């Protein structure tokens, strides 16, 4: 194990800073971002994006992947993803609008914004709540959400061809396998099994 890995695994656990479990609705909202990160350090059941406290990684990820280095840039990116995102180009080219791809990225970015202190916990929850109505209107199951996420990912990946970033994304097979694991009813750790699709349509409750 390298020095960087040792340092990460000696950081405090996220649940030591945020011990209160998410409510059913909160877990459902966080779970919209579950397709994005396949890393074992990613937290699936907290608003904080990692299983261990690592604000620096959240800040670096936003800067390197999204050129987000301030609250204003974060707000601008979230607004763009909520209004049009990648689905606008997908609709123009292919006639379909994969909202799930934009929604998953939106949630991931909002969580990292909270993780590095660009926005408060309250602001992060408000951001997540803002994306819920359009997602609920568009999809009726996690399966539908997953299918559209993968469609959106493919459109995004196709758009990278011929650019310097063409080799950056993980293989499509890796994304497919990750989504299958999230959808597997036998996977007890999947947040999609912990918070079924219709959770958000019922009164919120403690877990």
Q: What is the role of each PLM region?
A:
Residues 2-207:
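Polar/charged low-complexity regulatory segments
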């Amino acid at each position: 194990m390298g020095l960087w890995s040792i340092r990460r695994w000696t950081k405090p656990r996220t649940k030591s800073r945020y011990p209160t479990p998410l409510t059913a609705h909160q877990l459902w909202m966080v779970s919209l971002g579950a397709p994005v990160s396949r890393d074992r350090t990613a937290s699936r059941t907290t608003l904080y994006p990692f299983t261990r406290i690592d604000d620096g990684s959240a800040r670096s990820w936003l800067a390197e992947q999204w050129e987000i280095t301030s609250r204003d840039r974060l707000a601008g990116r979230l607004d763009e993803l909520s209004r049009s995102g990648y689905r606008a180009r997908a609709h123009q080219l292919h006639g379909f609008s994969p909202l799930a791809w934009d929604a998953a990225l939106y949630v991931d970015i909002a969580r990292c914004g909270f993780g590095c202190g660009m926005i408060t916990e309250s602001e992060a929850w408000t951001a997540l709540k803002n994306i819920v109505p359009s997602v609920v209107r568009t999809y009726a199951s996690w399966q539908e959400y997953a299918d559209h996420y993968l469609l959106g990912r493919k459109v995004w990946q196709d758009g990278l061809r011929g650019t310097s970033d063409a080799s950056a994304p993980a293989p499509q097979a890796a994304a497919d396998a990750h989504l299958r694991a999230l959808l597997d009813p036998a996977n007890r750790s999947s947040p999609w099994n912990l918070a079924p699709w219709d959770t958000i349509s019922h009164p919120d409750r403690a877990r």
